[in-house]
Amino acid sequence: MNDTTQATDAAHAHSTHQHSMQALAIAAIGVVFGDIGTSPLYSLKEAFSPAHGIPLTESSILGVISLLFWAIVLVVGIKYLLFVMRADNNGEGGVLALMALSLRPLDSKTRVAGALMALGIFGACMFYGDAVITPAISVMSAVEGLEIATPHLSHLVLPITIVILIALFWIQRHGTAMVGKLFGPIMVLWFVAIAALGVYHISRVPGIVAAINPYYAASFMADHLLQAYVVLGSVVLVLTGAEALYADMGHFGAKPIRLAAYGLVMPSLVLNYFGQGALLMQNPKAIENPFFLMAPEWALLPLVVLSTVATVIASQAVISGAYSLTSQAIQLGYVPRMKVLHTSELAIGQIYVPVVNWLLLAVILCIVIGFKSSDNLAAAYGIAVTATMVITTVLAAVVMVRVWNWNRLLVGAIIAVFLAVDLGFFGANLLKVAQGGWLPLGIGALLFFLLMTWYKGRHIVKERTAADGIPLEPFLQGLLAHPPHRVSGTAIYLTGNDKLVPVSLLHNLKHNKVLHERTIFLTFVTRDIPYVRDDKRLSSRDAGGGLYIVKAEYGFNETPDVKAVLEEFGRTHDMTFELMDTSFFLARETVVPTHLPGMSIWRERVFAWMHQNAAKPTDFFSIPANRVVELGTKIEI
């Protein structure tokens, strides 16, 4: 009886685990695979663009489909799903998390560490270059289905695209938790639909299945040489969104993402691309829009609607990714403080960054109006994706060797294959710089300059502050030996360095000549891991006389919370804190550019402007504005 009960419990636990895994996989399909899942809308059409001069013969169709197939297998199926997703930072993926992991065993002052940091930041910047193109090309290519379904409405493609995009960004501030539950089932329907379309056309031209043989890809490259290399720049469009598999790993876990990819997403994509190839072999004129021309006439409008919804979901994933990346970059010190709002009390990862939201919308609308069609925009797409892919491969190699201590020869062999593929795609996309590739490169380069300027500027400010600083604990001992007038209440001094006296305390003593009976020096520190356990978050030192030095550690995926820190500190020290009875003292730094060693004067002016426009600490740390005392200080850099 006991054995039977144990067996039943084990079976129940296994069933529950399987159900949970399937639920996570469906949720992942709605968030992770939107971008790569909507690539069939434009990828094959762009590969046979008239500008490439590739004839629509049977051999070239088989060759291009073979290239698409092996690109998906090698980059998505093997590189990302089997190798890169192993390189997680405490479960978190993405280029910044990977950069933080690769830097962990290195001295931050070495050139290697500096180069890896610059690579990681550039990869993050290129993500933003991708983030402004994905919503534009995805939504536009879906709405362009109207040109096939109802040609007399073709003049409405641009206005409808603009309205959809404005609506999408407008609802961001309200959060997407409610509609987000529908994303998974809708995208499952999308993948089933595109797979069914593919199967129908493959059944009519079974010969297309021969494209599985890599001989056709190699033969196509050999026959067309330079033209074929140019086509590689379009083939990479089937991989847009592959980085999301890794970047969103922290939300869903590696197993559900792999289950979704191998179980539904990759088979559906392959079937659809092969179906489009079969259609072209039967009717080369279908190159006008092979995706929508796969559908029977009665299904065209429903397919346009479904594809539009799917592209909105894909865009949502990119937008959410931009918020998350910005939040990580703020915590790691690469971006000025910005207002970050949490749109859900239950889901930690659901945030909204107003500045990023409206900047993205402004740039995306300019792109849509400027490029006018998905065909024109396709040339701009790909270069940001491939640049990030190359950077991810390099950082993953460093992690394999330096963090995991894998055999260098083994890592070299694996990475050589991946880099050969990545650099091949990247080189092919460099050929498209003049046609539109300049756009993501320009956006990425501008952001890289701003982020590196901010990081360097903050480093200089810290050096200047440390050089002029006074050690905190000896100062406090002297203060207690000759105390100023003590006043009732609690004072909290926010400081960036728990070893030095806050400038705000010096100013308060100089001008007001008082010290509160309970004084706390609070420092927030961001670790190179995504989350810090609650029991490891706080450390404190009692300096005596009601003076406490408190350090709160957060991961780069977390947002510092003053109220929560005070509550936790109060619990461990048998104290109570009322925010409205507490005074917060902050130093308001004014950065003054000078000719001192550091950065060139014009970069210092850019940094000073960024510093001046960063979100106020009161907004960022959610401190009641009427409880804050700001004391000004000038820092020459």
Curated annotation (Swiss-Prot):
<keyword id="KW-1133">Transmembrane helix</keyword>
<feature type="transmembrane region" description="Helical">
    <location>
        <begin position="24"/>
        <end position="44"/>
    </location>
</feature>
<feature type="transmembrane region" description="Helical">
    <location>
        <begin position="381"/>
        <end position="401"/>
    </location>
</feature>
<feature type="transmembrane region" description="Helical">
    <location>
        <begin position="433"/>
        <end position="453"/>
    </location>
</feature>
<feature type="transmembrane region" description="Helical">
    <location>
        <begin position="261"/>
        <end position="281"/>
    </location>
</feature>
<keyword id="KW-0633">Potassium transport</keyword>
<feature type="transmembrane region" description="Helical">
    <location>
        <begin position="113"/>
        <end position="133"/>
    </location>
</feature>
<dbReference type="InterPro" id="IPR003855">
    <property type="entry name" value="K+_transporter"/>
</dbReference>
<keyword id="KW-0997">Cell inner membrane</keyword>
<dbReference type="InterPro" id="IPR023051">
    <property type="entry name" value="Kup"/>
</dbReference>
<feature type="transmembrane region" description="Helical">
    <location>
        <begin position="351"/>
        <end position="371"/>
    </location>
</feature>
<dbReference type="Pfam" id="PF22776">
    <property type="entry name" value="K_trans_C"/>
</dbReference>
<dbReference type="GO" id="GO:0015079">
    <property type="term" value="F:potassium ion transmembrane transporter activity"/>
</dbReference>
<dbReference type="InterPro" id="IPR053951">
    <property type="entry name" value="K_trans_N"/>
</dbReference>
<feature type="transmembrane region" description="Helical">
    <location>
        <begin position="225"/>
        <end position="245"/>
    </location>
</feature>
<feature type="transmembrane region" description="Helical">
    <location>
        <begin position="299"/>
        <end position="319"/>
    </location>
</feature>
<keyword id="KW-0813">Transport</keyword>
<keyword id="KW-1003">Cell membrane</keyword>
<keyword id="KW-0630">Potassium</keyword>
<feature type="transmembrane region" description="Helical">
    <location>
        <begin position="151"/>
        <end position="171"/>
    </location>
</feature>
<dbReference type="GO" id="GO:0005886">
    <property type="term" value="C:plasma membrane"/>
</dbReference>
<comment type="function">
    <text>Transport of potassium into the cell. Likely operates as a K(+):H(+) symporter.</text>
</comment>
<dbReference type="GO" id="GO:0015293">
    <property type="term" value="F:symporter activity"/>
</dbReference>
<keyword id="KW-0406">Ion transport</keyword>
<keyword id="KW-0472">Membrane</keyword>
<feature type="transmembrane region" description="Helical">
    <location>
        <begin position="182"/>
        <end position="202"/>
    </location>
</feature>
<keyword id="KW-0769">Symport</keyword>
<feature type="transmembrane region" description="Helical">
    <location>
        <begin position="64"/>
        <end position="84"/>
    </location>
</feature>
<protein>
    <recommendedName>
        <fullName>Probable potassium transport system protein Kup</fullName>
    </recommendedName>
</protein>
<keyword id="KW-0812">Transmembrane</keyword>
<comment type="similarity">
    <text>Belongs to the HAK/KUP transporter (TC 2.A.72) family.</text>
</comment>
<dbReference type="Pfam" id="PF02705">
    <property type="entry name" value="K_trans"/>
</dbReference>
<dbReference type="InterPro" id="IPR053952">
    <property type="entry name" value="K_trans_C"/>
</dbReference>
<feature type="transmembrane region" description="Helical">
    <location>
        <begin position="409"/>
        <end position="429"/>
    </location>
</feature>
